[in-house]
Amino acid sequence: MMKLLLVVATSVALIFSVTDLSGEGPKHGGESMLTVQIPDFRLIPTTGALGPESFVFDFFGDGPYTGLSDGRIVKWLANESRWIDFAVTTSAREGCEGPHEHQRTEHVCGRPLGLAFDKSTGDLYIADAYMGLLKVGPTGGVATQVLPRELNEALRFTNSLDINPRTGVVYFTDSSSVYQRRNYIGAMMSGDKTGRLMKYDNTKQVTTLLSNLAFVNGVALSQNGDYLLVVETAMCRILRYWLNETSVKSQSHDNYEIFAEGLPGFPDNIKRSPRGGFWVGLNTKHSKLTKFAMSNAWLGRAALGLPVDWMKVHSVWARYNGNGMAVRLSEDSGVILEVFEGKNENKWISISEVEEKDGTLWVGSVNTPFAGMYKI
């Protein structure tokens, strides 16, 4: 009985830690850059769905574009201050629109997460959690699969992507080979390490660059294209994967090394900042109890066998106890330079991404029915 209580208590701590109010602060010495106040911060509702996870601007600087929980990709019209439909990730749209719990239908309707434009063609590439790696032309519409069917079906949880503008190579992540997005808490609790970093090149070949990753998430190419930064959410760290073996500058395992670790929360997406370095969205802060739970995966696996809907538990808790933030890391050493977080009543449920464009921070969250816009 005592062992069962320990399992339940620790598992609840792990679930709640995704929104833990006692989260630890940054350890890299960054000062808080922004204390968000309502007059400074604009919330932009995403009509009909929620979860603007990631942002991207097109070749002309228009947008941003973002994917939503009902499978749509929408475009922001700045002059009209409204979103318009741009694309969908599947033509099977029956039952996808309108107010309902989209998590129950996202495996049918699609859930677009990472987005990136191929600037040479104008095509928008999409990492859809269920439909795999997709693309749609400059005028939008229904996206089509990029990979052969058998390869696309092998992707269990396509999450993020980036494109080399010089070569057209697409780098993308598959968060788990076991768990799908609608049960991502299971991947976190179980200690799953089946995530992969992959690439799709001009010869239409798919290559696995890294495997055995713990909930691999965001990916970003460096400014000069010599390395990738890859987020391991469950490990609260970021890896640097060198694309050119001659570029390795330190003692690393194979051709990757730890770029940043001990982050103050669970990292999600990562994007380059035009001011240098990388913005990392931290879904939520964590605590010492979180670290204990994450380092004892057997507890989480045991809890998954209990008759509890852990996704529902997490969803309800997160709704009322948000604690998201974002950090900007230095390009060379991964040191925290700036911190973005709300204060008091303006705390975020979660932050999945910060995209910086023309002096504005676009803030995304997989859980909210709005995007945030902050003028620096």
UniProtKB/Swiss-Prot annotation:
Pfam families the record matches: SSL_N, Str_synth
Signal sequence, start to end: 1-23
SUPFAM superfamilies hit by this protein: Calcium-dependent phosphotriesterase (SSF63829)
GO CC, alphabetical: vacuole
This protein's UniProt keywords: Glycoprotein, Signal, Vacuole
Compartments where located: Vacuole
Domain of life: Eukaryota
Glycan attachment points: 79, 244
Protein name in UniProt: Protein STRICTOSIDINE SYNTHASE-LIKE 2
Taxonomic source organism: Arabidopsis thaliana (Mouse-ear cress)
Organism placement in taxonomy: Eukaryota, Viridiplantae, Streptophyta, Embryophyta, Tracheophyta
Gene: SSL2
